[in-house]
Curated annotation (Swiss-Prot):
Names of required cofactors: [4Fe-4S] cluster
Cystines in this chain: C104-C344
Keywords from the UniProt entry: 4Fe-4S, Cytoplasm, Disulfide bond, Iron, Iron-sulfur, Metal-binding, Methyltransferase, rRNA processing, S-adenosyl-L-methionine, Transferase, tRNA processing
Enzyme nomenclature, EC number: 2.1.1.192
Gene Ontology MF, one: tRNA binding
Protein's UniProt name: Dual-specificity RNA methyltransferase RlmN
Note: Reaction proceeds by a ping-pong mechanism involving intermediate methylation of a conserved cysteine residue.
Organism listed in the record: Polaromonas sp. (strain JS666 / ATCC BAA-500)
Reported function: Specifically methylates position 2 of adenine 2503 in 23S rRNA and position 2 of adenine 37 in tRNAs. m2A2503 modification seems to play a crucial role in the proofreading step occurring at the peptidyl transferase center and thus would serve to optimize ribosomal fidelity.
The organism's taxonomic lineage, starting at the top: Bacteria, Pseudomonadati, Pseudomonadota, Betaproteobacteria, Burkholderiales
Binding-site list for S-adenosyl-L-methionine: G165, E166, S197, S219, L220, H221, N301
Localization, UniProt: Cytoplasm
List of catalytic residues: E91 (proton acceptor), C344 (s-methylcysteine intermediate)
Amino acid sequence: MTANLLDYDLEGLAAFCEGLGEKRFRATQLFRWIHQKGASDFGQMTDLARSLREKLAGSAHIQGPKVVSRHDSADGTIKWLFDVGAGDVIEAVFIPETDRGTLCISSQAGCAVGCRFCSTGHQGFSRNLTTGEIVSQLWFAEHFLRQHLGRQERVISNVVMMGMGEPLQNYSQLVPALRVMLDDHGYGLSRRRVTVSTSGVVPMIDRLAKDCPVALAVSLHAPQDALRDSLVPLNKKYPIAELLQACTRYQASAPRDFITFEYCMLDGVNDQPEHARQLVALMQNHSAGGLSCKFNLIPFNPFPASGLKRSAMPQVAAFAKILMDAGIVTTVRKTRGDDIDAACGQLAGDVQDRTSVDRRIAAQRQGMLGGIKVVVAKGMDV
């Protein structure tokens, strides 16, 4: 079996080249061809010696994700469904803005955390993605978008690990993928523009601070443990006090001077004025220890299995005002891609359990998505 070169960061690729009897600097050339130019054929790499290209052809390949379908939202958001084998599907979403392009990518097929408000969690957990499967979402999206938009310059400026899965429960594959994103010979993204979102795996937050500190977003969703236990089951293992202490430690290494806290607004559950006041007290208590925060209030995207409802916008505005009046920087997330199930918490689409995955792939391959624009894709020609 040949090696998929998307599985390697630059150091790993250098070791691979040495194993072929080549100098380490060849890895830099190869890395640029793969990630900056989107090459998938060694024959394209004209500045590499023919002998090296022949070695690579016999021992390696560059395999991107298998695209099942592409969905285009009326607001410009694009969602791809990728088949990663054995009935597992993952999704990535591109969100265009006037000043940036953000790609939301997955780290696992499914998710084991099981947050009550997240449809992905209701799908269940299948497996961790490999480094190559994580990186390939960016590799495919960046080079597809350049073709699609007719642009030579970089399209994706921000990456958020907010797709399917808990990134810090796939740590060994996540960190090399982050290094590829950050490497100047790869995508050259700023640490400030790569965000890992976590439900609160405390030991891995500490490791990430040492190994590859990028922007951190924490799914908080409640001001006290009893409520968070019911919404984010991982809280029973890593309660709020431990989580915020880890965030304070992380901030010393973080590329931004604050930690973002995500808060999904659930009608009658966590959106009352007393919840906002409890959050203010909680953050003021930890700010004395050096924690600086920003809150991102997220409108809930309903799905039948949750039994939850979205907070009314006046309620969200009142909640935000309490936080802002206390000096906490607060934003309300604008939902994007709702019409293609690409918004936050919707990245399982219509998957409610593992048995429906095969039916879902088959339906989408046939373009049977009830009015959603579907483009069945082969390779990069989407």
